[in-house]
């Protein structure tokens, strides 16, 4: 299993000093970790597009990989729960927020694909879908003047991918993994704080290893 960390240069220090070491400690081989560092400062949307093109040109389209962002902390059983995927059809979300838990329905695990896109903090995507995104973007987004004007240059990488997969594969499912595989700790490492539409911080609905967050906070305080 391969893992791609989507990183901006300002957070590379956290990825190299904390995130990757925590992955190695659980048994993930370094050669299976791809750090996609946005050194060109493309921004989320362009960087996501280029990472999809990289996968299309360099990775097997019969396989898939986990995509995680540079401002997360992984659960203590992250590798155990991500190292194998029973099938290569559905998307798997390792990050689910409280606002999706309506009447407990997210505990059921499997939802229609149109709900998956909010979980780009940690998501498993079959490589064939990321490859198809390149064609879809070039065909539908670039050629649609209004669509391109609305989203070009923005941070709508997750939304654009949601639109792509919903259009091309409307029958696939999103498998939501609870307890969550990661928690969002941008507030500890700086440079952005994401909020949902209700103004609440974008945190995992259920991250069982809160002690890891406390441990990281202490390490970061010592680092300063």
What are these model-predicted stretches?
Residues 1-68, 72-224:
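Peripheral/terminal regions associated with large enzymatic or DNA-binding modules
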């Amino acid at each position: 299993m391969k893992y791609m960390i989507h990183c901006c240069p300002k957070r590379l220090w956290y990825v190299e000093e904390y995130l990757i070491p925590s992955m190695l400690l659980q048994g993930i081989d370094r050669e299976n970790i791809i750090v996609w560092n946005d050194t060109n400062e493309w921004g989320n949307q362009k960087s996501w597009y280029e990472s999809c093109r990289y996968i299309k040109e360099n990775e097997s389209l019969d396989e898939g990989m986990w995509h995680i962002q540079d401002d997360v902390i992984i659960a203590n059983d992250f590798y155990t729960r991500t190292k194998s995927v029973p099938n290569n059809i559905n998307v798997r979300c390792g990050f689910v927020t409280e606002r999706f838990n309506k009447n407990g329905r997210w505990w059921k695990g499997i939802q229609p694909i149109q709900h998956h896109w909010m979980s780009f903090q940690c998501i498993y995507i079959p490589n064939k879908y990321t490859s198809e995104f390149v064609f879809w973007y070039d065909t539908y987004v670039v050629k649609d003047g209004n669509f391109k004007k609305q989203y070009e240059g923005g941070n709508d990488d997750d939304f654009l991918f949601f639109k792509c997969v919903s259009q091309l594969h409307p029958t696939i499912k999103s498998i939501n993994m609870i307890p969550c595989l990661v928690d969002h700790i941008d507030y500890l490492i700086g440079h952005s704080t994401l909020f949902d539409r209700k103004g609440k911080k974008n945190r995992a609905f259920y991250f069982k290893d809160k002690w890891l967050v406390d441990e990281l906070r202490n390490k970061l305080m010592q680092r300063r």
